[in-house]
Amino acid sequence: MKKPMTMTQKILANHAGLDYVEAGQLITANLDLVLGNDVTTPVAVKAFKTMGTNKVFDKKKVAIVPDHFTPNKDIKSAEHCKMIRQFAKSKEIENYFEIGEMGIEHALIPEKGLAVPGDVIIGADSHTCTYGALGVFSTGVGSTDMAVGMATGKAWFKVPEAIKFVLKGKPAKWVSGKDIILHIIGMIGVDGALYKSMEYTGDGLEYLSMDDRFTIANMAIEAGAKNGIFPVDEKTIEYMKGRSDRELKKFDADEDAEYSRVIEIDLSTLKPTVAFPHLPENTKTIDQVGEVNVDQVVIGSCTNGRMEDLRIAASILKGKKIKKGIRLIVFPGTQNIYLEAMEEGLVRTFIEAGGIVSTPTCGPCLGGHMGILAEGERAISTTNRNFVGRMGHPKSEVYLASPAVAAASAIAGKIVSPEEVL
């Protein structure tokens, strides 16, 4: 009799050529995509060159996205990008994305149809878990793992245990995927899902857009998880239309699959949520925030730089001005999102409100460039991490929130609910 498995276990078993896997088992799985960026790929290239091979395992299944320090912020980052550009050309890697066609990797990869339901994907970036929104097993790895993946098309894994999140009910207005995942991390902690799979189910999924799901899956790593994953449904299938010719594979968890925990969440009871410094678990609902003034507002990133995020922010900012002295930085997730935001008039809205709109980049999120904080400064940001010094000076502060709360806070000059400015 076949033993029951979770979504993640079924995908891993399929890619390992096994009928069944269980938590804790060590396996070797075939990979559908190996991903790197301009920070992690140079190290992977050096490791690759020591492996005695001159070819990547599949020119179509390696993707390199220069996004962290691009457009190049200094000579060192320019040299890194030159190195990986030459490597991609020499290995005839088809999915190397130059800055004119690039985006923040975890917004770009799904947009380009390179993540397909049922895939196993590794990326030398911790937020590779984003693609779980599409029913993909995807996880971050080190640069040497990326090198081995590029050479062999394989990676080894310890099959994770799973936590089942049963989402029920309809979220209230202004409650988004960001608020849901911040609520979850606040509840279980930054190590609450350590090396576990966060698997989402329940009737509440029908109210979550694909952009909401990308946000929730993106921040699985902030709870210490190996991956986050959603079941494939009509919304997934609709999103994938026209993006890939590859077969979509649906792996549903067995009803009697084993979970280390089952957590039920009534989405209708949630409120807009803010993570205070210096951990994503340090959450408060918007009515508990109090008087917190901010210097900078950042809207974008691989967490919240998609069209729905920009539309929500623009709907609050339209016809209004941000408070004098506040710096508003908006960075769309990809060039296509940027273009669509221009065509819809969202870019005009942001600029007329007093903000700037940046090319797609990871820059501000990791304290790299395009919006660094000085000593004592405070930012509210739609990004995913608020560790000490994450966005600049060690004595600066980062508050994590949704695009709606961030946009409202830009107008008020302090952290507020959208209702307070509308």
Swiss-Prot record:
For [4Fe-4S] cluster, which residues are the binding ones?
A: 302, 362, 365
Name the PANTHER family on file.
3-ISOPROPYLMALATE DEHYDRATASE LARGE SUBUNIT 2 (PTHR43822:SF16), HOMOACONITASE, MITOCHONDRIAL-RELATED (PTHR43822)
Q: What is its EC number?
A: 4.2.1.33
The protein in question is named: 3-isopropylmalate dehydratase large subunit
Instruction: Quote the catalytic activity from the record.
Output: (2R,3S)-3-isopropylmalate = (2S)-2-isopropylmalate
The family database entries (Pfam families) matched by this protein are listed as: Aconitase (PF00330)
Q: Is Lyase among the key words of this record?
A: yes
Homology family: Belongs to the aconitase/IPM isomerase family. LeuC type 2 subfamily.
- The keyword Lyase is assigned to this record: yes
Q: What does the Swiss-Prot or TrEMBL cofactor note state?
A: Binds 1 [4Fe-4S] cluster per subunit.
Coiled-coil annotation reads none
Which example biological process does GO assign this protein?
L-leucine biosynthetic process
Q: In which pathway does it act?
A: Amino-acid biosynthesis; L-leucine biosynthesis; L-leucine from 3-methyl-2-oxobutanoate: step 2/4
Q: Which cofactor does it need?
A: [4Fe-4S] cluster
Q: Please give the subunit comment from the record.
A: Heterodimer of LeuC and LeuD.
Q: What class of enzyme is it?
A: lyase
Superkingdom assignment: Bacteria
Q: Which gene encodes it?
A: leuC
The task this protein performs is described as: Catalyzes the isomerization between 2-isopropylmalate and 3-isopropylmalate, via the formation of 2-isopropylmaleate.
